[in-house]
Amino acid sequence: MYNGILPVYKERGLTSHDVVFKLRKILKTKKIGHTGTLDPEVAGVLPVCIGNATRVSDYVMDMGKAYEATVSIGRSTTTEDQTGDTLETKGVHSADFNKDDIDRLLENFKGVIEQIPPMYSSVKVNGKKLYEYARNNETVERPKRKVNIKDIGRISELDFKENECHFKIRVICGKGTYIRTLATDIGVKLGFPAHMSKLTRIESGGFVLKDSLTLEQIKELHEQDSLQNKLFPLEYGLKGLPSIKIKDSHIKKRILNGQKFNKNEFDNKIKDQIVFIDDDSEKVLAIYMVHPTKESEIKPKKVFN
């Protein structure tokens, strides 16, 4: 039985669910879950939690992501990416803008911005996913959502051809960010229809492309009994949270029993959640959170016995 976080390289054409389904067959275990959906046409890093690490999947999801995308100016689509039908076209020429214009424009997208999620997305409105409305040719009002663009920059020259302009960007962002919407919004700012024509996730939850294994590689390592060496411990998935190492055996026991504590027994500055780690074994003992009604106390959120 495997326990840990496995960064998978998801190839284009597979859904995230496909990856989990195939892994369950390869590893012969049902206790597997991914940490955030990647669209079928998107390749890249998909961290998968296995065994007891499934308990930290939410925290891996919260740790942020990085992407490399190709923005195509001059044509918009129904899905905001290359898979959709053409909505609008408008010829683009090198006299319309240059790379300095793009660089200045991208600066405006840094920080917390608002996005309207695409109709072809899994965001729910009135209990129904947006893509379900889209497939029935229905349109609904989509609420704006705030997303965090930690960094964005151009990483290629501008390529003007066949009345379109293509260039690559790298984006570091928080969860819930739609890169294809970012591409269309860049077009709007330039005064042109636009879409995202290619996307690769290069980092997710602290895992990067060089850490990631294809399904074929995973199958091979499993058959050689050497896959466990490629798994990251569940503690890795909690590195985005503050932590305290516990030496006292009596306190360890109280933590594992799920007892409440006064904040000043540890660090009175605990604002939200804290991870308790066994100083001897380096294993996580529990995740505690500030009590919702008694701010001076912390209570267990997850205990790892």
Swiss-Prot record:
Record CDD domains: PseudoU_synth_EcTruB
Enzyme class: isomerase
EC number: 5.4.99.25
Disulfide partners: none
One Pfam family hit: TruB_C_2
Keyword set includes Amino-acid biosynthesis: no
Active site per UniProt: 39 (nucleophile)
Protein keywords: Isomerase, tRNA processing
Catalytic reaction equation(s): uridine(55) in tRNA = pseudouridine(55) in tRNA
Family matches, as HAMAP family: TruB_bact
Protein name (database record): tRNA pseudouridine synthase B
Native source species: Staphylococcus aureus (strain JH9)
Gene name of this polypeptide: truB
